Amino acid sequence: MDQFSTLTEQEFTTFAMTHPAGNFLETPEMKHLLERRGWHCEYVGVKREGQLIAACILSKKKVKIGYAFDIDGGILMDYTDKKCIEAFFTGLKKYVKKNDGLYLTFTPNKQICLRDFNGGEVEKVNQETFDYFTSIGFEHQGFDVHNFDGAPRWLFVKDMAGLTEEDLWKSYGKDAKYDIKKTWEYGVTTRELRYEELPLFKKLTEETSARRNFEDKDLAYYQAVYEEFGERAKFMVAELNFATYLENLHEKLRKLQETLNEVNEALIANPKSR
């Protein structure tokens, strides 16, 4: 019989690290991060004859007259196993109600529509799972690409497995190739920031959020991510190397001057070709 229950951190970690749908949102590090941000979190899941077959992080936060519950990036389970799904959500509903839950938001790590490079619809997938969620009371919040208050609803994923550098270059569109060539020309380099440089990262995200109209996190959040995830979290910046940029400009000027000299020499030798 499938049984919904709370889990230990060791049970969850062992299961999540080997699950094909595992992701950073469903890790002990994320649970600890959420708790530092004021959420209370539990590991919950479903066991079948003592064997764990589904798991996720269930978070809750106090609101005016109860608690708001949230699952982000889960549930780690086989969505084709109907008995498991039913056991999970039946148990989850009881758990949320027992713990004064006002509402539950759920962002599954599950595709609903595949799209091409330009955003055009290719194929709808997992419709049966989607229909099941709505049948038990969930309301879909739509596919707004501009405003979101949590996990983004649209993701761009590029499979680079087995690609050589040449293959990868050929896969880029014309605009992408142009932009990359410009970064080479300008001497743009990337590097990983140290913990003490996170205020610089915060300054960049703050300016970008104001320009692009999205809500930024505070510095304490980025510091907590760095502390909890350690080497698994990468804070990267792109920087313009002015010395390299100037050198490239001088080289471009030199080549242009060579071309100009060749043209002038040709005109002197053949004045009537003007």
Provide a role label for each language-model segment:
Residues 4-65, 116, 136-149, 155, ...:
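A conserved beta-strand-loop-helix scaffold within acyl/acetyltransferase catalytic domains
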Residues 66-148, 256-258, 263, 268-274:
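Acyl-donor binding region in acyl/amide transferases
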